[in-house]
């Protein structure tokens, strides 16, 4: 009786699973199968084959795929695990179901197929990437969410942010530019007000200091997001805002696999501020003048248009004075022209009704606009500002593996047009990842990522306030071109006063080349030692070159040569970080221990030079290629060199008993040269506990439909070292304006005086975030339905901010630890595999999160 009730429960769960897929809108991924038709001289007679598919407990497997090998002929099992299929005699059937090993079985005429599927332990023990290692998902004590390859492949994202979008707890902004990869990322709320609150990025096990556009989404195998302090505390000073771990693809054993893909799309502007077309522009001027000139109190005491009077009680403007004569009859037009009130204007000799209408709207203040209006010439400034951009993303890769070597190579090219005219972005990306097993105890590997990208353009200005250049504020009766067919500098009037703005005229006098060349590398070696020990060395050097060449021609009409010329700048970054990791992993009966000790160091150096050349003679016609002729007193140059370091020591202990009770503890000590001399080191740690209650005896009756149920509890503390200028805790000397005469031994010298412009902050401490998390994880029907729920509370103290000082101190502010920020919230994620067979996959994902800051 009890078994039957469980069977009914399982059927109900399956029905609910299918209904969930219909209720929630989710893209459906269809795997296309090539169909090849061969001509045959004879046709074999098909026969009916039936059978029952069950699991190890004897329960029917619902929705298992049964496929005739080498064909697209297939079916799925019903609620009793039964199937019937017409096949060629002696053919082989492929039976598969998520969470179970795939089985091939040859048919025998007249014999039913009764098959018991065995669980696929590799799928049930899904591995996630955590700090400095991996863990089974079942063993996690912290809040970790994994974005698997199927989502990446199905959605074909164009940026890392697109991959992350939709993950519960993550807030991903939108970047409407052609680049499209500068969208902000926020995990579980804003942790800090005065410092950077973005999550730490880890690429293939090493901290990543570049921008996310350098990572090709097509190269990503999986992403793991460490949300709570327990899972992220291993990264200490850089993990207060969470950690996003990106793992790139590697080859699989077998023949080389070649993938080529193209992603073509268009971009259009979203809702933007309203602009006036020709009809709207006229109505605006009519309504504005009616309100400004004619609004007044009528005989009935009410206020309305055309009620304004002079001191004698005469109407200033009669009703309909600002009406468009083209909407009136011939008789009405004559009355409209002659009835002008006290302050109105009437027809001039030889003037048309339309001309009078234009004068009443004061278009005659701009003869150019007046002429265009009378002749019906208009410009659509919206089309001149926006466009439908065409985006191209091409990728190719080759990968493979042998028993000793694993390799993956890829190339990618992006050429994007933004929705704003002139907004463009292009980039070339390549990636090489290779690992080799030199001996049974030594493995080495390298990961080299290269990118060359443009990073600037001269796009149409949209302006941020009324005084900024913005073509959308031009009249539709303004002129794009002058009478000679050249771009008009002042499209509204032809004069600087109320002249409007024409991007295309100004663009002739500007040029820009700006971009980055980046090389990210990771080199590693791993030695397997006796007694469960292993040692791994990783080092990640990073090189970045930046160039910026900007030309502003002094030939721009009405421009000052002293303010025009060439800006040339370059910079170079060299960063490296390394770690030495010792891991001990040992199982004693029902006890599982994993211990990790890590020593880490990093260094960052930055150099830049900038030249601003002005008033170049005899001409700046050579653009940014010529600066020698600049006026030295009107030009300037600057340099900036930055150097900072960090070091860390950390450890993590994981213990599991019976794969049922888990404990994780971490401790990390971080040192950073950017902090005050009295507090360069910070200590961070965490504790996490989890209980797989589904393994308890009292849950044995639920094993038929529940794969796993787990309770998680965690507490931890993380730090934040990202507070801008790495020298802000040191005092600073600056050159004062002007000069002074200095006398020594009767001799005078003219010197530039120095003064202290910044007060030292030797007592600045680490910004710390403490977090508590409680979570539940569930898996049903062999992983076909999963659920994760988390409640968290985070509190940031000793926030690093600028504190104002009284004026008598001689300084405006000092860096200090001020204030607190608290975040608390709830997250839930539901994932289901509604249908999965050889030709069709239907997955559904639902996420919900709420955060209170």
Model-derived regions, located:
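Acidic surface patches and DE-rich sequence motifs
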Residues: 55, 78, 310, 482, ...
